[in-house]
């Protein structure tokens, strides 16, 4: 009798093992996160596969995430010399005084390299640096014409990427009612920009101290520019890319991180605060890496 019971136990245990049910843990489903932002999107940067969407194709104000395209246009210039010097004009200073946006605190009369301007553009989100770059790389005899030309290049770049829901009317995100994109499109702009090694280096830098040349030829050590993207410090594997904010845009963030050879890149638009946009991005990236 005992032998029969033992045999039955062995048979039953074997059947359970074969079926994979003994001690098995049910697979945990990955739950799509809830975010505070009005719109969001993320994709696998290597494959282009969509990982997350929330109103991903709705046009919204982009704030300073616009500067991703500003940098992309500059870096696409033929025969670009990153060490070329740009003299800071009073108009750039007057612009930030009048609009009170984020700035790199560039000094009128100083000579600043294009490379330094890119750091001033992307780390502290300097609208003065954006103006200087637009003035440098636009075409025309007057600053207004050059700026208009540069914005035209930004729109041409968007068109070339097939982004029909994106339009720029400013070089820095301080729009005049026609500066918009979508979470999906901003992600694609960032993905394209990240193909450039200089761009990648700039946007993953946490802090940068520029040494500029003054009107008298002396060297000025600027106050250190700190990256406004807090994820570079708080999220393992973060590699960029750009924050944005404004009365209409609210709180925006284009983000990217690499883990285990997989890069998740995405955007949140119109979140409720700086901590909220970083939390939104963290949730989306965790979700993207778990898929």
From Swiss-Prot:
Signal peptide: 1-29
Catalysed transformations (reactions): Preferential cleavage: (Ac)2-L-Lys-D-Ala-|-D-Ala. Also transpeptidation of peptidyl-alanyl moieties that are N-acyl substituents of D-alanine
Residues where substrate binds: 242
Active site (UniProt): 64 (acyl-ester intermediate), 67 (proton acceptor), 125
Pfam (any one): Peptidase_S11
EC numbers for this chain: 3.4.16.4
Effect of residue 127 to A/N: 10% of wild-type catalytic efficiency for aminolysis reaction, but increased catalytic efficiency for hydrolysis reaction
GO cellular component: extracellular region
Gene Ontology annotations of biological process type: cell wall organization; peptidoglycan biosynthetic process; proteolysis; regulation of cell shape
Gene Ontology molecular function: serine-type D-Ala-D-Ala carboxypeptidase activity
Key words of the record: Carboxypeptidase, Cell shape, Cell wall biogenesis/degradation, Hydrolase, Peptidoglycan synthesis, Protease, Secreted, Signal
Pathway: Cell wall biogenesis; peptidoglycan biosynthesis
Chief location: secreted
Annotated localization: Secreted
Function: Removes C-terminal D-alanyl residues from sugar-peptide cell wall precursors.
Family: Belongs to the peptidase S11 family.
The protein's name in its UniProt record: D-alanyl-D-alanine carboxypeptidase
Upper taxonomic lineage: Bacteria, Bacillati, Actinomycetota, Actinomycetes, Kitasatosporales
